[in-house]
A protein has these predicted regions:
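N-terminal subdomain of lithium-sensitive/metallo-dependent phosphomonoesterases centered on the IMPase/IPPase/PAP
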Residues: 1-79, 219, 241, 248, ...
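Active-site-adjacent structural elements in enzyme catalytic cores
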Residues: 46, 50, 58, 65-134, ...
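Acidic beta-strand-loop-alpha-helix segment within the catalytic core
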Residues: 97-185, 232-260
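Alpha-to-beta junction loops
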Residues: 190-195, 218-219
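AMP-binding (ANL) adenylation modules
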Residues: 224-229
Length: 260
């Protein structure tokens, strides 16, 4: 997993240096893909297939590549933060998670621009370039920095989202909105941000980051405190006290659509 992430990161970094080599197309509303996403994905798939030809691979750009072993799934976002990459804003990552019978067991998030490799193995903690990670120990929202992402693919939730944001803003110190969900969760794990919330994510956005945050002592849940986020894509993360305070503030602003 680490080898695949580093190889993909090298492809991405090379193209970042030569912007003329990047071709962009639109695949949906406010949703872009580049030849670099596809090249990074291809090298990840090739690396996995070499060692584990029988595993199933699920990727953002090309969907499911079935293997004979349905129990082991690799969930991959070859370039999380494509919009930043296109705009030449150096904040994006490669996200790789290995799920066995539906449980994430191994996770890698790699930031090729900073050469930061976040890794986690279930039950063995999370690391950044080999150093153990612990999430922030904030006791409540006072003074906290919260990360988030706007629902740019689900603008029907814009008003509700802005209400939640406004409510939390009166309690916390400030927000960060950086454009890569995988790195947001990795930053929860390192304590660079105290908490994180976002709605309408896809499994490959957070599959790896979720385990890394958990293994650093964070809890991850949906907007009602449940575990339905794999289906809804609505996610809240942080240490238990921060998450409890975030949920309490969000509760009053949730629309019915976001309570699922």
């Amino acid at each position: 997993a680490v080898r695949a992430a580093r190889k993909a990161g090298n492809v991405i970094a090379k193209h970042y240096e030569t912007p003329d080599s990047v071709e962009t197309s639109q695949k949906g509303s406010n949703d872009f893909v580049t030849n670099v996403d596809k090249a990074a994905e291809a090298i990840i798939i090739e690396t996995i297939r070499k060692s584990y030809p029988q595993h199933t691979i699920i990727t953002e750009e090309s969907g499911e590549h079935e293997g004979t072993d349905q129990d082991v799934q690799w969930v991959i976002d070859p370039l999380d933060g494509t919009t930043n990459f296109i705009k030449r804003l150096p904040h994006f990552s490669v996200s790789i998670a290995v799920r066995i019978k539906g449980r994430t067991e191994v996770a890698v998030v790699y930031d090729p621009m900073r050469n930061e490799l976040f890794t986690a193995t279930r039950g063995q903690g999370a690391q950044l370039n080999g150093y153990r990670l612990r999430c922030s120990n904030a006791r409540d929202l006072d003074g906290t920095i919260l990360a988030t992402g706007f629902p740019f693919k689900a603008k029907q939730h814009a008003t509700t989202y802005m209400n939640i944001l406004g409510k939390l803003f009166t309690e916390c110190a400030d927000f960060r909105r950086t454009g890569s969900a995988a790195l947001d969760l990795a930053y929860v794990a390192t304590g660079r941000v105290d908490g994180y919330f976002e709605l309408s994510l896809k499994p490959w956005d957070f599959a790896a980051g979720e385990l890394i945050a958990r293994e650093a002592g964070a809890i991850v849940c949906d907007f009602t405190g449940g575990h339905n986020y794999m289906t809804t894509g609505n996610i809240v993360a942080g240490n238990p006290r921060v998450v409890k305070a975030m949920l309490a503030n969000m509760r009053e602003e949730l629309s019915d659509a976001l309570k699922r």
